[in-house]
Structures are given as C-alpha cells and as structure tokens.
C-alpha cells in the first residue's frame, strides 16, 4: 500500500482483514486530511464507502424477507404507496431484479449529487421525480443501477416505517458495534471531525473534494471506519453472527450468498446484491465503491473465512486498489486442493450465440434524455479474426471448448448471447454490452456530425469571402434584398450550429461532473 500511494499520488489508505470471527489486521497509511496533517487511523478515520453501502441495503432487504414483510419475487409496486413503476413490459419489477441489477432501468447521472444538505429531498420524493425509463424486460441482462438499490432501500423504509439511515443504525450498525459509522447525511456532529477528506489526484497538486450529499441514500450514503467494516464482514462470514448479536439467520445468509443471477453459467454473476468474483478457482463475494474521490473495495472468501476491506482517499486509487485485492487473494486464498462445488445455475433468458462483429455499448445506458449522447459517442468496436479470436476493449479473447472466450490480458471471460427479443449481447464477468443498430454506431454519428459541420463551415465562410473582396477593392456581387436576408439567416444558423458543436465538444471532453448536481 505505501508503494501504491507513492505511485498514484493518493494521500492515504485504510485496510482491515478478518479471518473467521476475528479481526486479524487493521492499519492506516498516509494522510486522511492533508491540510490538517491528520494520519489515517483504522478505527477512527471515516471513509465514504460509496456503493458498498448497497450491501447494507441488501442485508436490510433480507432482514425484512425474514420477517415476512417482503417477498423477493413480488411486484415492487405493492410496496410503493406514492408512485408506481410503469408497466412497460408484461413482467413486473421485483426485489430480486433490483438485487441482480436486472430490472431493466436506464441509467442516469444528472441530479445524482447535492451540494447543500438543505437541498436534499425526501427519498420517496426524489425517486418519484427521477423514475428512469424501463428499456428492457426485467430478468434478462444485468445493467448496474443505483436507482434500483435506492428503490430497494426506500421499500425497506416503507414497510418498517423507519427512515433509511435510522433503520441502518438500529438494525445493522448498533448490533454490529459499528459505533463510528453512519448512513446519515450530514454526518453527525460527533463523527464529523473524524471524516477523512478525499482528493482529486488526477490534478497536480491533488485538490480536496468538497463533501457531496447522496439523494439516493441507500445507494451510497454510508461513512465507516475500517474496523467497523470488519465487523460487517465477520457477520457475513459467520452465519449472520457478530459476538452475541445476530443480524440474519444462518439459512438467510446462505440464501443471500447463493448465486441469484448469471447471464451465462460459466460467468460470474450476482448473489443477491454481492458481485461474484472468481479468483484462483475460488468464488468470492465482493463489492466496490467510488464516491467523490474515495475508492473502496470489500471482498469475502466464504471458502476460507477470509475478508478484506480497503479504501483510498484519492480518485486514482481504484485500479491500484483492485490490483492489491487480487494480490491479496493470490497470497492468502490460493487455489483450493480440490475444486469448489459449482454454484447453482439460475435460468437465464439469454442463449449462446455466434460471435458477431460490430459496435457495442454498455447495458448501463441512457435512452430517453440528453445523456444518450454518451451512448452514441461511447460505443466500443468488436472484431472477429479468421481464427476465431475476438478483439474487444483493447484485449484479445481466445475461444475455449466450453464456448467462452478468455482474455489474454486479464482474468476475465466473455460470452456471446442473444435474448428472446433478438437483441445481441457480449457479456463478461463484470459487464454486459449490447450490439448497437447501425444507425447508432460511432461512424454513422460522426458522419452525421460532418453533414452538419461542413455546410455550416461553408455558409459561415461567406462573410469572410465578402470581407476579403471589400479589402481588395473588388465590387460586391449584386443581390436582391430577399437574397441578402436569406444569406444572413443562413450565416446565423451556421454560426449557431458551430457554437452548439463547439459547446458539445467542451462538454464531452471536459469535466462533466457538474451535471451530477442537475441542469
């Protein structure tokens, strides 16, 4: 970790390791607050764990499944008193879909951050006002959804009558003795002085990032210490127990840790909100989280009772943290002497397909707002060589006897699949991608831009030619008043088009994070 901090310029990091029912290691590295000169401390420094908060949300859902208040396979609309998920498809959205990120919601970023606590809306109001479009049938393919997790947390609040942060404190943080952690925003005064600062380490020198509020709280509002996170890991590795407390029944923990979705049986999938990650032939359960400069990861190895939590307070810590996680597993969770039993194989609506070249985009996409520009201009090219080798995401993937493709540059696997509606997908262990229709591919969109730009440039150049002729003393071409008006309107439209395209480039190539606060 110290070497990683030097290489990345990240100010600090914190880590905790558990084995069975015990915390076996915890430490802090570097600075939690550069300006204040405050060192990272594993049991005092709070970090914002981002999407790892979802694991607390999913655990809360399973608690309410135990009580009988929630059913993973029921239409979520029966739990929503103030708004409803539209019946875009015959199949309703369920809590299981939310946990598997297969609800079929489009993704959005605009309005997902709030700069001032006074502007934080009630969770239910926010979810009703920001209801995303349903763009594919539920249960078909995963598309990571922050909205889905927030919706699940809201449902827990509805059926229990407790605000999300209060529920998490009473039913998870307090039983797990996580006294130095909170899901509340703003962070309580008693903990505020111990909150680590995060930094944009892609700039020199690194710049501190202001505290930003999460309107979708169940998606990412938790702030926690490394040792408190160790208690959460211990409970999940020990059938829901931590000391004398229990947050889940053993059978519920086993159910939660079982695979609940995989697009292909040979790929990693989801386990009721946990992400599967196969390393050295071992199945691990993990989740990562990134929020405003913090980069965190949590991984459990049920087969050997091992858990790791790691967090950096710099924006360049994500990839380095993942590499440390893999090295940790290589060292402390090597390949088992006998292969682990394979996970159950939930039925998938996708079937294997032949490789198909073209342009693909992540299933985590937007279809109905201006954010679709990211999809249109952010597609990835996939090619298939004569020997069957696939080139995708800058990597070579070689076909295997089991129908999967293995990457030569990483530990990932890939499969080509087709849905019942004919949509074509490329699915890896981490992400699913959908084949774009030709009308939405990058070359076509660039061609459309050229069709707009070239005439605009030609029209806008006419006043330049007129000015040059005047400077050279050449007589102006005689034109009618109508022609002069039309020419003026054409030039104005051309200049407007060029200004729009210029602004578009600034937006796409510049810092787009401000859009998270809304437009």
Residue ranges, per PLM feature:
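Catalytic tyrosine of NAD(P)H-dependent dehydrogenase/reductases that use a Tyr as the general acid/base
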Residues: 47-50, 142-144
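Short beta-strand micro-motifs enriched in acidic
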Residues: 275-279, 299-303, 383-387, 416-419
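Short, surface-exposed loop or secondary-structure junction motifs
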Residues: 28-33, 87-302, 328
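Peripheral terminal and inter-domain segments
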Residues: 319-519
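Short, conserved catalytic-motif segment at the N-terminal edge
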Residues: 1-47, 69-71, 78, 86, ...
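Active-site SXXK
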Residues: 15, 21, 48-73, 149-157, ...
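Short, well-ordered beta-strand elements
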Residues: 286, 297-314, 424-428
